[in-house]
Amino acid sequence: MGEVRTVERSSAGSAALELLVHGVGGATPEKMLNDPRTVRITGDETAAVHRRAEDADADAPAADATTTVRDHGGRPVPEAYVWSNLTSGNGTRALWLLLLPFMVVNLAHWMRPAAREGTRAVRLYGLLVRLAGLSLTVLLVAAACEVALDLTAWQCAGTHACAARHSWLGFLSPTLSHGGWWSPPGRRLALAALVPTALTGLLWYLSHRTWRAYESQEPLDRDPEPRNGPAHTALSRPGFWYGRRLVARLRAGHTAAGLLTVAAAVGTAAAREDHRPGGPPVLDALGRLLEVSLAAGALAVVWAVCRRGRSEHRLDRRLDAQLVHRLPLTALVLLTLTLVYAAWERPGWQSSGRLPGDATFGGIALAQGTLVIALTVVAHLLHKGPDGEPAPRRDSHDTAAPPQTHGSGDPLAPDRHHRTPPAPDTLVDVLGVAIALPAETPTETAALPSPRLSPGETGESDAHPETPSAARGTGVGPAKAGARPGPPGSGEAGGEGMAWSAQDETGERGAGAEPRTGLRSPGDGGGGSAGRAGAGGPGGARAALRGLGGPAVAMLGCALGGVMSGGVSQRVSDWLDGTGTFLDGPPVLLTWQASVIPVLLLVLLALVGLLGRRTWLLTRAERVAVAREYDADPGDPARTGRIARARSMATLTDRGPLVVAVTSTTTLLLGAGALVGAFGTGKTPVRAAQGAGPFVQGAAQAGQALGSWLIGLGFLLFVTWGRRAYKDASARRTIGILWDVGTFWPRAAHPFAPPCYAERAVPDLTWRMSTWTRATGGRLVISGHSQGSALAAAAAWQLRPSERRRVALLTYGSPIERLYGRWFPAHFGPAALVALHRDVDCWRNLYRLTDPIGGPVRLSGDDCGPEVDHAPLADPLAYGRTEEHPLPAPILGHSDYQADPAFAEERGRLLARLHPEVPVRHA
């Protein structure tokens, strides 16, 4: 046996790997590797790593016994990690649409403001979101009970005309079956209870199956990093992507809640009959005992959901076995006893009106509104911080902004690039910007400056080689002291450090009318300071809605659950009672909730008009900027308009906080009004408006009619979309894009939410990078597009610090800061991104102004070293026909970043910068 020593080898003979991770919508390995012949190296049909066929043996032992791997002349071996089947998969994934409210409320858990871990406010925030998720489970099962028990078994089967209209209900009708065995109300309810029970069982099965496939994928087992340290982020914890214990616990609690909801719907109807004067004493006592048992079961469910949150600081392989098995089993036993109790013979019992328990939906709506308000208070306190003062906010007028540079390196003249107000979050901010912005206001602002270092700066700290330098992650300059020198400005080594200039990136490129420096960064209404690391302060000033994104999204999830519940109830009621004369219909509250939908649509229509006006004004201003950048004066007006329109439309993503704020606030207010109207009058809006003025009566009639029609139409469209996605792969991929964003996060608030694909993808990438770097000692670039960049960053965080320093990160079209940094500030906020920037060997980010998803990472300044962001890429590459582009260049937006020459340049610089130490075996 020979000993293994570590010696330095030049980059020309080092093992190098380029790991490609695709984004939303998926991709094939053939397209990612640009080769029709690919082979699967590791993985399965769901997610796998592929290589070109010619590179299949790149990791095989070399013929020379002195080296551990074959020498490929320094050429990086490209690998493609394909994970699209994790979200699009087979046709059954289309059924995940039914779980959309659960997914939305689960997102709210991860949207909390940045705060110190372990505080009571942080724990309270998670507890409130879990309770909101529990209320959605109860709401969904209650809606199934409303359809099966109330509308079908209680009302329709108990009405001769309705049962005669639907012959399949004849055996349940007391008149049509001539008093058959199933005709008593209790037995009808017991039989109909099988429908919501089966729904609960289906949800349990889907959650259990996906739990075994996703949450049970073990990440790398390693020591946790210090809590609340300067480089601390929850994404670096060993157990972050291993939620096996919590999901099992929540699944037990939510399953029991669903079964107890069914038992309560059946048992309360029978108990009310037994509690009347002259009722059978034995059944009366059993009914009261059953009610106490159901209340105790409900308390046990709430305790199980609230008692424990996530355990992320270690791989928690334990399971609460007794709770996981006994709680649902106990609830099932109670449900069985309730069905037997309800089916007992009760002479003279007849069904009339609506099923008792009509107030259930009102109680759920009240509880959800209270939880959202409490969540808002907690989120506001977390965002303000412990001192009670809001985090400092820097905007585009901050005098500390770094100097902006043109392609020539000179400061931009004030009359060439102007600034606009920072991207607004609140309704007042956006109204002011949209209304006050004149048509002639230039919207072009300085691009992020191209990174430079003074001669002699290396971007590395020689005095403390083990400490990640503030200059690491530049993507250029030497990686190690004594690296091979390069020519001045090459960015490869020597004393020039980070030496390529803005002229190399975005300067004038000849007669092709290609653009000069770009515009403002997406999501940034202002200049450079808004993009500097730490611009948000500890509280994150760029956090969406001032840290209230979580409560707003939780409100939307509850509203979506209400719309789905009301929609299915309304459609089934209309189907059973075609003339509207047989049945009392669904609960009054559901009718009120449907009646306020037209008002919500009017508000959203006004908001769309406001955003449309702003986009139109911005497009006019962008036309001037486009003509100046491409030297296209006069140019082609249609071509200029398309480019300007693409840029202005891309900024609509940054208006997302406004849309969410207006929608959630309006929904909360209208929901409160519907609750007051339903409980205050006990009548539908039309009946409640009788005797009022003609205008009020007309508004009530229009609202109720339109609301009923709209909610039914929405339900039909929802089912149609799901059915189409079940059969059509392209539609399934479209739904997969929704899941790409919504199911990135683990299931922390709702076990019935669609599974978190990152709990499979992140361990896959982490294991691949860790094992490869340890086996070869080589260099590695992980390249992520769109959502793949979030996976790449999450995987890098999961590496050991020593392995993290051997990894370079290339992101393009990345939503890491533009979406994740704003909506999830506790996990992708400035502090977390700065820590990642310092830990990895180098990081470069590419984006376009026409990209509605990707944007800058905004890391620059003295606190984190030189910038990560490349200046905005030109899109299109050329305005007209040129030698390099004889045909009109397309506007690429979010796709085909590899088509830009800057991509190959940045990729080459990252690979050249990594100079690893490779283990060499000596006899």
Residue ranges and their predicted role:
Residues 766-776:
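Conserved acidic catalytic loop of the alpha/beta-hydrolase fold
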Residues 776-779, 805:
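Short coil/turn segments at beta-strand junctions that form active-site/ligand-binding loops
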